[in-house]
Design a protein with these regions (language model features):
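Conserved segment of winged-helix/HTH DNA-binding domains
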Residues: 15, 74-97
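N-terminal helix-turn-helix DNA-binding core of bacterial DNA-binding proteins
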Residues: 9-50, 69-80
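Generic helix-packing signal
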Residues: 48, 53-54, 93
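Alpha-helical residues within the helix-turn-helix
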Residues: 42, 53, 59-60
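Short, intrinsically disordered or compositionally biased N-terminal tails of bacterial proteins
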Residues: 1-9
Length: 97
């Protein structure tokens, strides 16, 4: 498989999103489905402001999506590729344990 130099940089930037444990916690909460900030904060044991900040980073990078229904906003994984990446990564980590 051959890629361009731009794709290498884009891929490196993509994987940097997974280098923050707070973002990983949030993504694992979202594996179970769409949630509001308050619920994500509770499940990830983080403050709502910290969760909101990380959600903005993930949303700008198209890792998650935001859905508004009236005044309610929920967040979910953008697609099954993100779910698969997380599942493969955790399987790899647990492989040697």
């Amino acid at each position: 498989m051959h890629s361009t130099e731009d794709e290498y940089f884009e891929l490196a930037d993509f994987y940097k999103l997974f280098s923050d444990s707070s973002r990983i916690k949030i993504l694992f909460v979202l594996l179970s489905g769409a949630h509001c900030v308050k619920h994500i904060a509770e499940k990830a044991e983080m403050s709502q402001s910290a969760v909101s900040h990380q959600l903005a980073v993930l949303r700008r990078s198209n890792i998650i999506r935001q859905t508004r229904s009236g005044q309610n906003i929920t967040y979910s994984l953008a697609d099954d590729h993100v779910k698969l990446l997380l599942e493969l990564a955790i399987a790899h980590i647990r492989e040697d344990k």
